Regions:
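Short glycine/threonine/proline-enriched tight-turn/helix- or strand-capping micro-motif at secondary-structure
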Residues: 179-233, 242-263
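Short, solvent-exposed loop/turn segments enriched in Ser/Thr/Gly
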Residues: 34, 44-51
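Zn2+-dependent peptidoglycan hydrolase active-site motif and core
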Residues: 238-286
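A structural signal for short beta-strand/turn segments enriched in small hydrophobics and glycine
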Residues: 237-239, 295-307
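Asparagine-centered strand-capping/turn motif at beta-strand->loop junctions
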Residues: 54-61
Length: 382
């Protein structure tokens, strides 16, 4: 049995040696992935975003001590509290993050949410991984799954869905409390992450010298600057799903206007097929404002509806994402980039809370083309 010290040495030279010595008692851990990652340019940096599922097929307990990933010449090592914050045990959603999340009990599974920042480098064709686990006796083991093939598809480039000054709320990130990033749901016997690259768009203005997203009673939808703003089609395509007439929520109320179910979480919405297996979803629209019906063709810049607060929504905003199925929740989220805009920040702000936002020094606006904004970036679309 390899000692922990020997395994550490092996771990450091993992990618320079073809294989570890045979383990007489290999951990019965199966490693799979929710989907093949595809590169995305976020705030000027190439990133790979994906999820590793580890299932323990034995009765033994293991602690996930470290995960190493290699994509081309870029190498990443995750361990300790950082790895704990990236790891969730199935059945423990919403529980406090901590070391216990790295424990893989017999017959249980964990998901490790990975985000590899490659900087200016191009994405490699494969990602190699090594997992370091420790058994109940304190012995260390290495698990080396087959290389993960990276998708060679480029992100879809689309036009802006809005005009003016906006905050890109909860765009793809790896925080433990990232709502979109952790929204793994099962439908049809398959685990999906449709909202992997979703963004909640909230408009801001400067009021009395303070940047804020609202002014007036916080329990009124029309107090929020984004409310009733037009939503523009980001691409040419065909409407394949829509809903209108669902009532609006009272902002930050203790309950929704309707009982939230799988099929109404998007509220009033429009889904547009813009390419084979590529669907844009615009969610939470104001009732009575949806302009198209199923089967209609739309073109870039058409007004689809207006920003509202319907479905699973706590205050007015536009939720937008692109996935490979015509569904809000049952699909695989795919990367996309916007043709143009300017970006500053990001800011340290909870855009779902109706409070004035102290942005602090945010630097100058940076014009961009074909880019996806950083989490909570201030984005201007014209």
């Amino acid at each position: 049995m390899a000692s922990a010290r020997l395994l550490t040495l092996c771990f450091l030279v993992f990618f320079t040696t073809p294989l570890f010595a045979s383990d007489p008692h290999p951990p019965q851990l199966n490693v799979s992935f929710l989907a093949r990652p595809a590169p995305i340019v976020q705030d000027g940096s190439t990133r790979l975003v994906y999820e590793m599922v580890i299932t323990n097929f034995s009765n033994n307990k293991y602690v996930l001590d470290a995960v190493e990933a290699k994509a081309g010449t870029a190498q990443f090592t995750f361990g300790g509290s950082a790895l704990a914050g990236m790891t969730v045990r199935l059945g423990a959603w919403g529980q406090p993050e901590g070391a216990a999340d790295r424990t893989i009990d017999g017959g249980r599974s964990v998901i490790v949410f990975l985000l590899l920042d490659l900087g200016n480098s191009k994405a490699a064709s494969t990602i190699e991984h090594m997992l370091q686990v420790v058994d109940e006796k304190g012995d260390a083991h290495a698990v080396v799954p087959a290389p993960l093939v990276v998708s060679n598809e480029n992100p879809i480039v689309v036009s802006p869905p809005l005009r003016g000054d906006w905050i890109a709320g909860d765009s793809v990130n790896n925080r433990p409390d990232a709502a979109h990033r952790r929204a793994v749901l099962v439908d049809g016997g398959h685990a999906w992450l449709a909202q992997r690259y979703a963004i909640d768009w909230v408009q801001y203005q400067t009021v009395d010298g303070v940047r804020t997203t609202w002014k007036g009673p916080e329990d009124r939808n029309d107090s929020y600057f984004c409310y009733n703003q037009p939503i523009y089609s980001v691409a040419t395509g065909k409407v394949v799903d829509m809903a209108d007439g669902l009532p609006e929520n009272v902002p930050h109320s203790a309950k929704y206007a309707i009982a939230i179910e799988f099929n109404n979480a998007a509220g009033n919405h429009v889904v547009v097929e813009i390419a084979p297996n590529r669907y844009v979803l615009y969610a939470h629209m104001r009732p009575g404002t949806v302009q198209f019906k199923v089967g209609d063709m739309v073109k870039v810049g058409d007004i689809l509806g207006h920003v509202g607060n319907t479905g699973s929504s706590t205050e007015p905003h536009l939720h937008m994402h692109i996935d490979d199925q015509p569904s809000f929740l049952a699909g695989n989220g795919v990367p996309y980039e916007f043709t143009q805009g300017s970006e500053s920040g990001p800011v340290n702000a909870n855009v779902s809370s109706p409070t004035a936002i102290s942005f602090g020094p945010i630097g100058p606006q940076r014009p961009f083309t074909n880019d996806y904004p950083a989490e909570n970036a201030l984005v201007t679309f014209k």
